[in-house]
């Protein structure tokens, strides 16, 4: 089934994004999306918000300008045992959790280490999406990760931001192709997200 949504976006709260929640919601409506998820960076990312921000997300309306809005976080995978930078208590409150590897939070490792880190994150019952697993700085064995994602009902992300010419991620296209081939082989589900950091990227 295909839904028109964007489940990985950032607001001013992330520290290096440029628009408010309401501005992002309005942009999603303009793009004729059915659903928007706001997933600001969790606490280990330099410059992002305090845990209190995520604790208070429950106070926000889940509909803006006629579009459904979910609130969650892009959490950081902090080590190759799958440790995340958000407590279980907070994870339980999130509508959606994207788990990703970022160089400010995790030094790139070997293919064995990275694969283990993703597998451990996939096993976390609060993780819904593995964010941009296409960065060659974090080499991954998709032959192991794709079946695991299917087994645990975790979505693998095709991240539009990775494919932009100015992306900081290394050699994403071959990894995306490999991931998609294996998702087709194993009938695993993917999700296409913008990773928007401003209104012009929403739904892209």
Where are the predicted features?
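Extended substrate/RNA-proximal surfaces in nucleic-acid metabolism proteins
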Residues: 29, 42, 47-158
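Residue-level detector of anion-binding/catalytic polar loops
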Residues: 34-35, 155, 189
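Conserved short secondary-structure transition element at the edge of the structured enzyme core
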Residues: 176-194
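Histidine/acidic-residue-rich catalytic or RNA/ligand-binding cores of hydrolases
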Residues: 15-19, 48-49, 139-147, 166-182, ...
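Short acidic/histidine-rich active-site segments
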Residues: 41, 188-203
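Histidine-centered catalytic micro-motifs
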Residues: 4-14, 38-41, 130-134, 194-196
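His/Asp/Glu-enriched short active-site or ligand-binding loop at hydrolase and phosphoryl-transfer sites
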Residues: 155-168
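Metal-associated gating/positioning segment near the N- to mid-region
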Residues: 12-47
